[in-house]
Amino acid sequence: MYGPTVQRSANGGKTWERSKKIGLPAWSGLTVNATWHIEPGRPQEPATLYLGADPGVLFRSDDAGETWEPNLGILQHPTREHWFPGAGGLCCDSIQLDPRDPYRMYVCIASAGTLRSDDGGQTWLPVNKNVAHDYLPNPYPEIGQCVHKLLLHPARPERLWQQNHFGVYRSDDCGGSWERLDGNGLPGGFGFPIMIDPRPDRPAGGS
């Protein structure tokens, strides 16, 4: 459902109930406009869920989605004043958890780029090296990229793919640097969906 809400079911979808209000602290001056992405927690955390929302915020639930707490590392990120919404808003549209490192996770925000946490979400590092943004004076900024989708290789978590507003990229060093791939036969760089077939390591995207 589009909007600032989450519906959850405890019986396989026969009935649904709304989560308690998904809100932000008054001091932030922000309100939740829409929810964009829900990611389940790790197998050892079956009641944990992560939620990405507009305006570029991340939430965590440890009670199967009944209540949600905002991630302060994202909410108070020192670069936030330089984030700006794309056509769909300032949306946190991808969340990925490293299956080997219990403290490492990634979020993508359009238009802020990809951020990585190595301490369980307390702090976040922009990881956008070599990722272009054609509309900015600096074509390779530290932040500001419009990432539409991020995926992590399930068996090689150091490898990431992203479908960007301006291209398709791959990283082999946990987002430390990126290589652009859409010049290798794709009809265009713009798109939204991307998926991985890990055998034999074959990505597919739409443009």
Question: What are these regions, as identified by a protein language model?
Answer:
Residues 1-207:
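Extracellular glycan-interacting surfaces
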